[in-house]
Amino acid sequence: MSDPRAKGGKGGAANAKNEPKKQTTQSARAGLQFPVGRIHRHLKSRTQNHVRIGAKAAVYTSAILEYLTAEVLELAGNASKDMRLKRITPRHLQLAIRGDEELDSMVRATIAGGGVLPHIHKTLIKAPSKKKALE
């Protein structure tokens, strides 16, 4: 007869061979590049009254940060390619963020070394005269 205490539990092939179980990070489990554990630690330390932070909150926050970073880097990379450069500069980040309406409304910060967007008001541009247009 089998022992009634042998049901379930964590006894398996890995424990029978005395091999330690391979650790996987929370980021790897979630399929993310950003550090879920570190973000969870920062979320816990930054809250008032030290309220509890769920594990899914850190995963969700990491996913949002990773997505926004990828979006900005893709747009900045396109801006640097348009200028035929291989390195992303603060100017490229500025052009990428200010060129996208949603990112522009979300990022209201000043980017150091980003410069300004070129813009000339329509009333300041001289209309071509009719004499030059006829010639």
From Swiss-Prot:
Key word Isomerase present: no
Molecular function GO terms recorded: chromatin DNA binding; identical protein binding; protein heterodimerization activity; RNA polymerase II cis-regulatory region sequence-specific DNA binding; structural constituent of chromatin
UniProt keyword terms in alphabetical order: Acetylation, Activator, Chromatin regulator, Chromosome, DNA-binding, Nucleosome core, Nucleus, Transcription, Transcription regulation
Family matches, as InterPro entries: Histone-fold, Histone_H2A, Histone_H2A/H2B/H3, Histone_H2A_C, Histone_H2A_CS
PTM description: Acetylated once deposited into chromatin.
Pfam family name, one: Histone
PTM sites of type N6-acetyllysine: 10
Region: Disordered, residue numbers: 1-33
PANTHER family: HISTONE H2A
Function noted in UniProt: Variant histone H2A which can replace H2A in some nucleosomes. Nucleosomes wrap and compact DNA into chromatin, limiting DNA accessibility to the cellular machineries which require DNA as a template. Histones thereby play a central role in transcription regulation, DNA repair, DNA replication and chromosomal stability. DNA accessibility is regulated via a complex set of post-translational modifications of histones, also called histone code, and nucleosome remodeling.
Subunit structure: The nucleosome is a histone octamer containing two molecules each of H2A, H2B, H3 and H4 assembled in one H3-H4 heterotetramer and two H2A-H2B heterodimers. The octamer wraps approximately 147 bp of DNA. H2A or its variant H2A.Z forms a heterodimer with H2B. H2A.Z associates with the VPS72/SWC2 subunit of the SWR1 chromatin remodeling complex. Also interacts with RBP1/DNA-directed RNA polymerase II largest subunit.
Protein known as: Histone H2A.Z
Lineage: Eukaryota, Fungi, Dikarya, Basidiomycota, Ustilaginomycotina
